[in-house]
Amino acid sequence: MSQPPINPLGQPQVPAAASPSGQPSVVKRLKTSSTGLFKRFITVPDKYPKMRYVYDTGIIALAAIAILSILLTASGNSLMLYALAPALALGALGVTLLISDILDSPKAKKIGEAITAIVVPIIVLAIAAGLIAGAFVASSGTMLVFANPMFVMGLITVGLYFMSLNKLTLDYFRREHLLRMEKKTQETAEPILVTPSADDAKKIAVEKKKDLSASARMEEHEASQRQDARHRRIGREAQGSFFYSSRNPEHRRSFGSLSRFKTKPSDAASTRPASISPPFKDDFQPYHFKDLRSSSFGSGASSAFTPIMPASSRSPNFSTGTVLHPEPVYPKGGKEPSIPRVSSSSRRSPRDRQDKQQQQQNQDEEQKQQSKKKSGKSNQSLKTPPPDGKSTANLSPSNPFSDGYDEREKRKHRKNK
């Protein structure tokens, strides 16, 4: 498929007619140019680097011509001596530019900057000294030296010396000190700020791609599971029931509050020291403090349960939360074993507890003394033969643990009457 013609009407293309006006002159080009003549003159060294030396040398030459012409024209007594200040500044600028252009390498530039920072203030001070000395020579050492313009220019040049000393020399030394400190800091921090290895970079990339919200939810779920298992273990091993409810609504919604923990009677009887199971009753079930808390003998479900502390062999030492009163043990067929009485002493004062413990110790001592007396009498009765001539012990059917001592005493008392 051929392309359509550029001119579909078939008309020949007529070239544009040339402008009747002639070529623009040099003056018009300069006027319409985007850059001025002075700017082009200044930017010549940028286009041609070798022209820098020409410019620097020209600046120094102009400064020298200005200084010499001023000194010759003024003859040391004219106000034209005040023009020495800009001429001297122009000469110092030319010397500085020439030194910086000659030295191309970084090391050479560093040396040139050091020379400039040290030499320029010395040159300015020498000029000031020359001006002051010329003023003294012109005034023949009289008081007219203070009215001489050369002396005033010397004082102004001394001010320029201090300015150059501050701006060139001191700034150069400050910059060098900062560069040395920066280099020392980089050398010190380079071993610490090392680039990560390939494995470390891979781990960092994996950590960046990880879903932080999902990992946080997983950690929270695992923490709640560990807490739930810990409370279950405490409920199995502890001596009472525990109620737990989380303050976190999400945890409560996910797992719910923990109910009362229940254990088997066999496990509780073997692990808990609070269980009491006499060996003479086959169908007797051990009583646990968990059951006593809910029964009429306990202090109610609202009272706090305190685990029993180990007691000494001399006297029972129960916890302050509950007091356990011992009951006598009866043989099979006699009096039924009673449930241990549990009373709450959470509202008792420490003095009442001490009185109760003292009373308990006194009762224990009285029981021990009575048991010693009974054992002594039983030994005497065993040594003396019974009155009926039999050597066997006369056991009472009502009390199988008695040796008949009380019955014999009653008979003796009746005979004496």
Curated annotation (Swiss-Prot):
This is Uncharacterized protein CPn_0443/CP_0310/CPj0443/CpB0459. Residues 211-228 have a biased composition (Basic and acidic residues). The chain crosses the membrane at residues 54-74, 79-99, 117-137, 143-163. It comes from the Bacteria. Keywords: Cell membrane, Membrane, Transmembrane, Transmembrane helix. The keyword Membrane applies. Residues 1-24, 211-283, 308-417 are annotated as: Disordered. It is a multi-pass membrane protein. It is found in: Cell membrane. Residues 312-322, 391-401 have a biased composition (Polar residues). Pfam families: DUF5423.
